[in-house]
Amino acid sequence: MSSYPVNALAMPLSLEQSTASGDITESGDIIHARYILNRLFQDYPVAFAVRLWNGSMLTIGDGAPAFTFCLEQASVLRDMVWFSNPKRLVEAYCSGEVQIQGDFHAAMQLREHFESLSLPLHEKLGLVFRALTLANNQQVLPEHTAHTPHSPTQSQSASVPSSHGIALSYDVPEDFYQRWLGEQMLHSCAYFASPTHTLAQAQQTQLTLICQKLHLQHGDTLLDIACGWGTLACWAAKHYGVFVHGITHNPTQYAYALKQVQQQGLTHLVKIELADYRTLPALGSYDKAACISIADHLGAAHYPDFLAKVHAALKPGGLFLSHVITAENPAGQQDASTAFINRQLYPAGELTSFAHLLQHMDSARFDVFNVEGLRRHYVMTLRQWLANLEAQHASIAASMGERTYRIWRLAMTASAIQFEQGVTGMHQMLATRR
């Protein structure tokens, strides 16, 4: 992007804060902030407001602001200039240095703007010098962003260790997921046969579809890998009379799934085991196998070994249904902010492309004969989850901490946008064991 002389900046920002006498005044901080924000967002197509750390309000663009971007710390503005990528914004939102009021989905589009923003070095240095005068001021987070003692990460910096990422995704109580997953507790893509269907209806449709694709018959043996909360295992046993062996490495999910099996009177059909897929015996004893969204959490390097274990567990000719999130860019790479978010939830996870998945399936001696793209269904699923999560904001923040709520909200919104844009996909593959 070419540099712009100072007098070429049309400054589409307007100052909205007035003094008590009604006269509009600007301090040195406001002048510098105005200049910096004007340069960073001069080409941004959506109108929005900015509330600075001292309460001053600026508006960007024409029309009614879609959201208000609240900078609680002057240092965030400095970092926005210096790093010129959305990762710092993501970190700042999670830590409470940034607040978003209004349309959160629209605010997330700022990530794309920063992905494409390229400032010449001399111009970036000029903006940084301006920003440094702001960052030297001591800023204190306002009371409404104060860290809550319920979350172990509230005293940590915005950059969270990967071990905490595991805790965010796996080591949280079941009632957290119950608040937003839906009554079926299906932590994966639902299937909306109609856009008017509820989340519960769409989840039931997905469970039925999976069982039908696997051609489940009374007396079949089904291996449910990463069985989660036991939803598919109980559904298949209850509605199709199959024997299900579900495995999960998550103690919380294991306890919940066991309880569901007992409460639904399915102990004669369903066995839930706390185990890793790597411990599966190579007995070739299962008629069918299903794996709902584990590959995207494994990491690409582990996928061949995982498929080899599934192959060894199935009978020759057995059916395998794999339900996988894929990266739709050629290199299977993520932008910086998405990578940061995913590290908070699934630090070991890594998406790969659909083409690479097919290659892995073939190398593992699976013949893929049915593929369905479920990207639009995941968009609708995420919207429903997000609505549920936001409706439970107060209770989640009280029990899990504001930071945990923000990371999950950010992750769901970012995921929905990526599915909408086709950056990521969801593929349901059905294959036979050679």
Predicted regions and their residues:
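Conserved beta-strand signature within the Rossmann-like core of class I S-adenosyl-L-methionine
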Residues: 317-325
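A short acidic, Gly/Pro-enriched loop at the edge of an enzyme's catalytic core
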Residues: 278-289
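Conserved SAM-binding loop of SAM-dependent methyltransferases across substrates and taxa
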Residues: 229-240
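Feature captures hydrophobic
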Residues: 2-197, 202-203, 209
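Substrate-binding/catalytic lobe of Class I Rossmann-like enzymes that use SAM or dcSAM, i.e.
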Residues: 325-434
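Conserved SAM-binding strand-loop segment of SAM-dependent methyltransferases
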Residues: 264-277
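A short glycine-rich, Lys/Arg-flanked "PGG" loop and its adjoining helix->strand segment in the class I
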Residues: 304-316
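Conserved class I S-adenosyl-L-methionine
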Residues: 218-228
